[in-house]
């Protein structure tokens, strides 16, 4: 691929929300082009008012739309020029890391090519044409679709986490993100307990307690696992280093 030009018209609804404009501009730009090496990307976005419910950030907020654009374009190009859609993706996938996108973001890790190849092996992609022809003789249509998703976290780039051991044998996991139904208390404890080789029921989960949690930037922007879990793993490394040292 040489370049991508995206001209977006985003439905803001009948009123302007706090996150609606950001979802179709800044958030979308972080994923525009997906996991493909596209040296030049130009994007414009125009918000329009309609007689519908106001749009605001929910899950992903702009990244699904950006990924859909490039993935759909690849399928259209493959059909028009008689390319295999998987081969076209593999030919243009990001292969050298770290990779700087056209918008200046750095992608430092990712197994993009390997993920596509594993998916192909898992579904027996080579045998798809035969399965499709068999279905056709029975009066059925069989289709197949591929899509890669590049996710970027938003929100403040600062996070905190602490692991504290008490004389009683209990362990406090203090986190700066906050769960309001997503199940952080289960996911985080599972991650930390397995990393330390300890039983999960030894942990007490602490959030939203300003007497105990010294630093945190909350949830939102798909940042809790990106930022919160990464910070916890740094704390895990500190615990192990102290225990070994």
Where are these regions (language model features)?
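Catalytic cofactor-binding cores of redox enzymes
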Residues: 85-87, 112, 240
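Accessory "access/gating" subregions that flank catalytic or transport cores
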Residues: 90-164
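Gly/Pro-rich active-site capping loops and adjacent beta-alpha segments
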Residues: 1-66, 136-245
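Helix N-cap / loop-to-helix initiation motif
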Residues: 81-89, 197-201
């Amino acid at each position: 691929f040489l370049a991508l030009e995206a001209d977006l018209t985003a439905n803001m609804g009948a009123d302007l929300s706090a996150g609606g404009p950001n979802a179709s501009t800044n958030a979308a730009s972080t994923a525009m082009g997906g996991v493909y090496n596209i040296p030049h990307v130009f994007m414009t976005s125009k918000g329009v008012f309609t007689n519908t419910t106001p749009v605001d950030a929910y899950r992903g907020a702009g990244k699904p739309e950006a990924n859909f654009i490039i993935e759909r374009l690849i399928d259209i190009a493959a059909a028009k020029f008689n390319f295999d859609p998987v081969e076209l993706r593999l030919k243009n996938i990001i292969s050298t890391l770290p990779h700087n996108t056209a918008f200046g973001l750095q992608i430092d890790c990712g197994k993009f090519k390997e993920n596509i190849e594993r998916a192909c092996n898992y579904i027996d992609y080579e045998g798809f044409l035969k399965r499709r022809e068999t279905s056709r003789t029975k009066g059925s249509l069989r289709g197949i679709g591929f899509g890669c998703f590049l996710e970027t976290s938003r929100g403040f780039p600062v996070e905190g986490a602490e692991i504290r051991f008490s004389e009683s044998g209990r362990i406090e996991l203090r986190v700066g993100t906050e769960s309001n139904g997503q199940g952080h208390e289960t996911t985080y404890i599972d991650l930390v307990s397995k990393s330390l080789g300890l039983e999960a029921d030894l942990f007490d989960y602490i959030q939203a307690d300003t007497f105990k949690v010294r630093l945190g930037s909350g949830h939102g922007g798909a940042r809790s696992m990106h930022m919160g879990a990464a910070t916890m793993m740094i704390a895990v490394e500190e615990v192990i280093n102290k225990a070994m040292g």
